[in-house]
């Protein structure tokens, strides 16, 4: 019986996801790790970041469009504000369809 969990920190989880991507098994892994509600919440979070980065709608409008609370939008906004301009550029490149 193991006395320690296999995965103890965020970096180990990121390494696991990277390995799954390299083996083209990421969909199986991520689907197993999250319930349908958690997957929906993650999709909403990604859309929050997309809309905040576009800057075309108010937080209230984003909230209404995505069906999430304004506090959820605010938390996403605060996370985005904490990133450097370089990090924001990388995130925009990943998320925004040009």
UniProtKB/Swiss-Prot annotation:
Pfam families with a match to the protein in the record: Trp_repressor
Keyword check for Transcription regulation: yes
Major localization listed first in the record, in broad terms: cytoplasm
Cellular component per GO, a single term: cytoplasm
Keyword set, alphabetical order: Cytoplasm, DNA-binding, Repressor, Transcription, Transcription regulation
GO terms (BP aspect): negative regulation of DNA-templated transcription
Subcellular locations according to the entry: Cytoplasm
Known DNA-binding region: 59-82
Gene Ontology molecular function: DNA-binding transcription factor activity; sequence-specific DNA binding
Keyword Repressor tagged: yes
Family: Belongs to the TrpR family.
Name of the protein: Trp operon repressor homolog
């Amino acid at each position: 019986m193991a006395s320690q969990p296999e995965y103890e920190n965020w970096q180990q989880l990121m390494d696991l996801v990277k390995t799954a991507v390299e083996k083209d098994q990421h969909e199986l892994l991520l689907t197993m790790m999250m319930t349908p509600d958690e997957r929906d919440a993650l999709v909403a979070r990604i859309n929050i970041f997309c809309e905040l980065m576009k800057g075309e709608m108010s937080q209230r409008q984003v909230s209404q469009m995505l069906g999430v609370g304004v506090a959820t939008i605010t938390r996403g906004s605060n996370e985005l504000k904490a990133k450097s301009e370089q990090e924001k550029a990388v995130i925009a490149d990943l998320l925004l369809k040009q």
